[in-house]
């Protein structure tokens, strides 16, 4: 579960290392973000010479959450960290590589480019 002020690790090569969630998109009453939700975030830590700079406001999609969640088949899955991938206005990733596993739920949310770049889909 991701909410306002949650810090997430960035799982791509845009140059950002850590982002802070400003808002979970999807309506005025949405409090928590789950895997596949789009958030607005601020870059808190970045590498020099990257595509995004510290302080920049970006859109990102959540790809991993530390809080376990159930799937329709009855199984549960959780990850070691909260992570996101920075995306553009067209919902395509701004980076060219994805690091670490991503959740299968991204396929249902039509983030096929992230699925194809990811080394592992769980």
From Swiss-Prot:
GO cellular component, one term: cytosolic large ribosomal subunit
A GO molecular function held by the record: structural constituent of ribosome
Superkingdom classification of source: Bacteria
Pfam family, one: Ribosomal_L14
Record SUPFAM superfamilies: Ribosomal protein L14
GO biological process: translation
Keyword terms of this UniProt record: Ribonucleoprotein, Ribosomal protein, RNA-binding, rRNA-binding
Keyword Cell division listed: no
Function in brief: Binds to 23S rRNA. Forms part of two intersubunit bridges in the 70S ribosome.
Family from the record: Belongs to the universal ribosomal protein uL14 family.
Record note on quaternary structure: Part of the 50S ribosomal subunit. Forms a cluster with proteins L3 and L19. In the 70S ribosome, L14 and L19 interact and together make contacts with the 16S rRNA in bridges B5 and B8.
UniProt protein name: Large ribosomal subunit protein uL14
Natural source organism: Roseiflexus sp. (strain RS-1)
Annotated gene: rplN
